[in-house]
Amino acid sequence: MLFKKLILIAVVVAGSFGAFAQGPEPVRRQKPVVANPEKKQEVTDPNQAQQPGRQGKGSQIVDDSTKNIYGPKTTLWISENDLFLNKKNYQPLDTNLANYHRWTYVQRFNNFYQDLGNVGTALNPIFPHVSETVGVTTGYSVYDPYFDSEAPVYFDSKSPYTSFRLVWGGDGRAVSRIEYSRNINPRWNFGFNYRPLLVDKQIQRSGKGDRQTISHYYDLYSSYRSKNDRYLLAFNYRRIRHRVNENGGILLTRDTTVNGYYDLNAQPYLLAAQSEEQKNALHVFQQYQLASPFQLYHRLDITKQINRFKDKANSETNYHKYFTFTNNDPDIDTANVSDGMDFKTIVNEVGIKGNAAFLFYSFYYKIRTYSTFNRYVDETLLSFKNDGVENYVGGKIAFQFDTLAELTGHAEYLLDGNYRLQAELKTPWLDAKGMSILAKPGFLPLAYRGSHNSWVNDFSSVFTNQLEAYLKVKWGRLFISPGARYVVLKDYIFYKENKVAGEQAVLPVQSSGNQQAFSPELRMSLRFFRHFYVRPQIIYTSLLKNDDDALRIPEWFGNTQLAYENMLFKGNMQAQIGFDLHWRSSYTALGYDPAIQQYYVQNGFVSDDYPLVDFFFNGQFKRGRFFFKYHNIMQAVTGKGYLITPGYRGQPSIMDFGFDLILFD
């Protein structure tokens, strides 16, 4: 039976591949603002779940009364962080219907990212993002959310578990996802995810299958416990190959006003350019309990990342119009462009950890080796090496006051002087977090050489302080959460437009001053007329200091949802019907340079304010969910769209449909 179902799923996938693409993952692992933030999710220990009786053949999924005994409540998962903290915080599958229609990456993360107007394109956070990596990095990050947004978790599935998701977006925008997990025995589980992402062009699409984004992600994971529970092993391997056919934005010809971006005959700048990122990551976590309050643990991470920009000059009609600078050095191939960087790391972390009453502690030593390669960069001319070894010491501590209140802290010190300090408090009425980090610059802003860019810099480490706190008050049908976020940056590294004629268009810059951003925020949820909800989120940002004009943040930023939520058809279907509204004030948004895969500060274009309104219908029946969504109602009414990134128009009005199914056999 299992084999037949997997074959059926494979046939469906193969038959639909022309429209398939991949976007966000299921609600189980998303971290947007939830519909009912005052509601606490149930915590379940797999040891408390009744074990099924052994059967002569196959798995027993029904009892003698044909009642299902396996389902979302018996298929449990746990994160590695909870395993590390010795928490038996197993969670049932989350089949929550709230916001199921938010399937694109930008909307999944509550519009806190900008992209290039299509699913799978380069992403950049609207608000300053604090990296948690102290040591050297590649400097490439615009495709990180497609890989990092869902780390593998580990299951106790009782019965085989299969999840299948498909979204058909208009004009070849779609999502597909398959996950399978099963227990080999009560102590050993394995599973996999597969997420192809195939998205058609939204500008001058020649027909179905004329792709802009081609991406394939998969992961394999397994967890094992010894019979006496002293030894634990968790393993996962992840891989992605993410390719985007870059169009360079819209080339204005007949109509050079803003309306020209929405012309049906609008042409792209680039025809043959492509960005690519490949990433492989092997992760192993294991621990052994010597005594009740004392454990030894080890982590191993092996990663490889390849970033490339490719182009064929003879295939471009606007090559020199778009790329105002081309490197004339004879060793650089500017006709068949293949620029970029390779980066490899191996990390070994060993330490001790344990529990004493309500206290958790850990201390560790970590060694990290790294190497990078750019075929056009001569390492002998640099003031630093392209490979090296980093040594860290650190520790974590957590106070679990009760099941709802916890205080955690983390300190990590790189022996060359860089560091990270972090503390977080979670209570039923207050969430607060603080972080201070001094981090090495990435390799890309330090040294790069390619067809359209070349530089060598001696940048220092970047200092960041971040504080945030949010109150949580529930008063009858009203939930309110006022709070604020304060960020301080010093020696901040960013990319900036270069207006000097004959020189490269974008250059990395290290600010000589500092930046300070203060962002008070208000989140609310109000229920009225029994089944109606309104959920606003409003953020005001004041740049208290912005040396070198390095930060570009809209002054006002808002998300609002108005929804009707109820059981329909005599209680056979749960429904959520309503409108999503996103709005932000006009500001000089960051531009994008595909040759180096970086967003940069520019002053020549203002992204106007625009109310982005979606209508959605989410439904749930038994073990399946579905949605209908009409995106960007305002453009259908006014005929005017929006520009989320200078030169790149946002998604026009369009209809999307999606569904998922979960099987237990």
Locate predicted features:
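Bacterial Sec-dependent N-terminal signal peptides
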Residues: 1-29, 231, 294, 434, ...
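Sec-dependent signal peptide cleavage junction
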Residues: 19-98
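Outer-membrane beta-barrel proteins
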Residues: 65-66, 73-77, 81, 167-169, ...
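Low-complexity, highly charged intrinsically disordered N-terminal segments
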Residues: 94-149, 156
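Short strand-turn segments of transmembrane beta-barrel domains in outer membranes
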Residues: 135-137, 149-154, 158-179
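Exposed, low-structure sequence patches enriched in small/polar residues
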Residues: 157-159, 276-314, 334-665
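Transmembrane beta-barrel wall of Gram-negative outer-membrane proteins
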Residues: 174-196, 209-243
